Regions:
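Extracellular lectin-like interaction modules
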Residues: 1-292
Length: 292
């Protein structure tokens, strides 16, 4: 059963109605798309759509054209990502600005009705903090976008106040476009300071791991022409375990680490080679969470 949170393409289903599929074959796919909309309508969103099945399924979500948060990005890419079941959600998440990005946003979705989410934002430059609470009154309800701006170094802690009500956090980012990609017009050159959009489901702290494999592939057509592109791995671990984290068998440089607003934890943006290459991050401590 699928219960979309927005009217679907072609007016086939209205928000809140149930789509029932009774005879999907192995390997068969079913697409639910939001209704047609104007270019400026950024509120078209299927966030919080509920999907239930009596047999194992894989669910992928994404969008057709993405400018997060700016249409000025020179590559408004398609984005598709596999969703995870509620069993893999959590109640405590830690976010920071990501290296080589312009503006970041996070969205938090509730698994159950009446989930109270606490959002603590720290300005690491001034030491000030701000706490906000959002009540998500329905299962699948999503918070307004949580801005994590690059103008100040920010650290964010997101918690579900009720430990029995897990949440899921999507982190949306726009790369810095340090290559200043330009196009010529009849009147002037237009240069774009925002790069490709991307998204990632941020792992909850309870789902930390002992190892993480990754692969980097330089794909920017302007990479190396003006300013080389950069790859980073973002990891967060217990402060006492920073010396137990390794990248490809070697210790992670201590100067990469910063204390998170929760001083029991530290995070690092680890530079990776600008080459087609595999990498392995491992911990002999209590584990870590990370994205690339």
């Amino acid at each position: 059963k699928i219960v979309p949170t927005f009217n679907t393409y072609g007016g086939k289903t209205t928000a809140g109605s149930t789509i029932t599929l009774t005879n999907l074959s192995k390997g068969e796919a079913y697409l639910v798309a939001s209704k047609e909309h104007e270019r400026e309508d950024f509120m078209v969103d299927l966030s919080g759509t509920t999907i239930c099945s009596d047999k194992p399924i894989a669910v992928f979500n994404g969008n057709q054209q993405t400018g997060i948060p700016n249409r000025e990005a020179y590559s408004q890419d398609f984005m598709v990502e596999q969703s995870i079941p509620i069993e893999q959600w959590g109640t405590e998440l830690y976010l920071t600005n990501l290296e080589n990005t312009r503006i970041n946003y996070a969205l938090v979705t509730a698994a159950y009705a009446d989930t109270k989410v606490e959002i603590v934002t720290y300005n690491a430059e001034t030491g000030s903090s701000e706490t906000n609470s959002v009540l998500l009154d329905k299962a699948g309800k999503t918070t307004p976008p949580i801005a994590i701006n690059d103008s100040k170094r920010k650290e964010v802690i997101i918690r579900s106040v009720d430990p029995g009500k897990p949440i899921l956090c999507y982190h949306y980012i726009t790369s810095a476009a340090v290559n200043k990609f330009c196009t010529s017009t009849a009147f002037d050159d237009i240069c774009y300071t925002y790069g490709d959009p991307a998204s990632a489901m941020m792992p909850a702290w309870t789902h930390r791991v002992q190892s993480m494999n990754m692969f980097t592939e330089p794909l920017d057509p302007q990479g190396g022409v003006k300013t080389p592109q950069h790859f980073f791995a973002y990891v967060i671990t217990k402060t006492e375990d920073t010396d137990k984290l390794t990248l490809n068998g070697g210790a992670v440089t201590a100067t990469f680490y910063r204390f998170h607003a929760n001083n029991d934890l530290s995070y690092a943006h680890i530079p990776l080679p600008n080459t087609s290459s595999y990498h392995l991050i491992e911990s002999s401590g209590d584990g870590f969470i990370g994205t690339v």
